[in-house]
From Swiss-Prot:
Catalysis: reaction(s): UDP-N-acetyl-alpha-D-muramoyl-L-alanine + D-glutamate + ATP = UDP-N-acetyl-alpha-D-muramoyl-L-alanyl-D-glutamate + ADP + phosphate + H(+)
Lineage: Bacteria, Pseudomonadati, Pseudomonadota, Betaproteobacteria, Neisseriales
Pathway: Cell wall biogenesis; peptidoglycan biosynthesis
Function: Cell wall formation. Catalyzes the addition of glutamate to the nucleotide precursor UDP-N-acetylmuramoyl-L-alanine (UMA).
Record's subcellular location: Cytoplasm
Gene: murD
Superkingdom classification of source: Bacteria
GO term, biological process aspect, one: cell division
Entry protein name: UDP-N-acetylmuramoylalanine--D-glutamate ligase
InterPro entries assigned: Mur-like_cat_sf, Mur_ligase_C, Mur_ligase_C_dom_sf, Mur_ligase_cen, MurD
Annotated GO CC locations: cytoplasm
Binding site for ATP: G117, S118, N119, G120, K121, T122, T123
Length: 445
């Protein structure tokens, strides 16, 4: 990819935007910076990092009118905005940091494992990275999981990696055309980000872009959208909780199997919940696709401790177990968390719903939830979508109130589950802050 005689505008000045500016400047590209809102102190801060950098703010169209050839977008900005659509129609190119990394790894020959899905992608990315490291590979873990990919590349000073393990969101895949992963997965598709996409099919089509190239596809046989992503002539590894597949769960014995071969008992997997069995199957399939030995992978799975805020037991009081799934920010994630827990539940739901339909939670909660506690700006919408179910629903002004009321109703053996199915920004700084408040409320009981 050449940028000779090209002017590039980087839009969005968070971590990803800054990493793109640094990469492009290092490669001698003429680059400027844009953000819809720029405070003087932020300009001063970034200006210290990049001498002479030109800043634009206000309307994006006005910035683009300054002769830019390429728009490098941070993932939080949709390329479907009218100003960006007009820029493309006039011959402008739009790309993101994953497209820039793709050019690097394609030229250098690094292996890439790429992971997306509505739910579980951070857990699978962390597990795959952990397994690769444990098996001795020089491994880079980056992307939506936290470290921008170009920041990770800069830290390595251009050194080739044995494997890149990338968590990719639909936002990052929108303008990624050249990535050709050695192995890739779409773990599942459920309603999320429907405030950005036309419908669920539109969202699924964006996820499907991860399968460009001729690498191994790892697909969920239990998900109709994922089944439809199978490409002709490609090697595919299927995983399933419902059917005999390449990787599957034998429910009678509680063992994961590969074909007819025993792999590991679910009781030996340190991660809570049945949905994590699918995460393990996907991770092992991805790692085998880059040549790692199965026996070593299964031994290392047993020592992986998982991630905070993802179906994580935080404590127990008088026999009532409290589980933090604050990262459950959409309906699919919450449904999976509920399905993976066997004891009676009191579930705390609510926050910013992102345009989701909450009716799929009706079946998930039926027969398992003894009570539902609603918080946040979209509590009323959730109540409407669950109306008519045989559920005891209680509106709460705060998360602390929800914890107190749930505990007051619970008995020994019950679970109080925070799995909101919503984003957190109406009441909290983020899902981690929401988790902190939940843990604090538990400790205060």
């Amino acid at each position: 990819m050449t940028f000779q005689n090209k002017k590039i505008l980087v839009a969005g000045l968070g971590g990803t935007g800054i990493s793109m500016i640094a990469y492009l400047r290092k490669n001698g590209v003429e680059v400027a910076a844009y953000d819809a809102e720029l405070k003087p102190e932020r300009v001063a801060q970034i200006g210290k990092m990049f001498d002479g950098l030109v800043f634009y703010t206000g309307r994006l169209k006005d910035a683009l009118d300054n002769g830019f050839d390429i728009l490098a977008l941070s993932p939080g900005i949709s390329e479907r905005q009218p100003d960006i659509e007009a820029f493309k129609q006039n011959g402008g190119r739009v790309l993101g940091d994953i497209e820039l990394l793709a050019d690097i790894v394609n030229r250098r020959g690094d292996k890439v494992i790429a992971i997306t899905g509505s739910n579980g992608k951070t857990t699978v990315t962390s597990l795959v990275g952990y397994l690769c490291i444990k098996c001795g590979l020089d491994t880079v873990i980056a992307g939506n999981i936290g470290t921008p990919v170009l920041e990770a590349e800069w830290q390595r000073e251009g050194k080739k990696a044995d494997v890149w393990v990338l968590e990719l969101s639909s936002f990052q895949l929108e303008n990624t055309e050249s990535l050709r992963p050695t192995a890739a997965t779409v773990l599942n598709i459920s309603e999320d980000h429907l405030d950005r996409y036309d419908d669920l099919l539109d969202y699924a089509h964006t996820k499907d872009k991860i399968f460009r190239g001729d690498g191994v596809q790892v697909l969920n046989a239990d998900d109709a959208f994922c089944r439809a992503m199978k490409r002709a002539g490609r090697e595919v590894k299927w995983f399933s909780l419902e059917y005999e597949a390449d990787f599957w769960l034998e429910r009678e014995t509680g063992r994961l199997k590969q074909g007819n071969e025993d792999l590991i008992a679910t009781q030996d997997i340190p991660l809570q919940g049945l949905h994590n069995a699918t995460n393990v199957m996907a991770a092992v399939a991805l790692c085998e696709a880059v040549g790692l030995p199965r026996e070593a992978l299964l031994e290392h799975v047993k020592t992986f401790q998982g991630l905070p805020h993802r179906v994580e037991k935080i404590g127990e009081k008088n026999g009532v177990v409290f589980i933090d799934d604050s990262k459950g920010t959409n309906v699919g994630a919450t449904a999976a968390a509920i399905a993976g827990l066997q004891n009676p539940l009191f579930v705390i739901l609510g926050g910013m719903g992102k345009g989701q339909d909450f009716t799929p939670l009706r079946d998930a909660l039926a027969g398992k939830a003894k009570g539902v506690f609603l918080i946040g700006v979209d509590a009323l919408q959730i109540r409407r979508d669950l109306d008519g179910c045989d559920l005891n629903m209680t509106d709460c002004a705060t998360l602390e109130e929800a914890v107190q009321k749930a505990y007051a109703q619970a008995e020994a053996g019950d679970i109080v589950l925070l799995s909101p199915a919503c984003a957190s920004f109406d009441m909290f700084k983020g899902y981690a802050h929401r988790s902190e408040v939940f843990i604090g409320a538990f400790k205060a009981l």
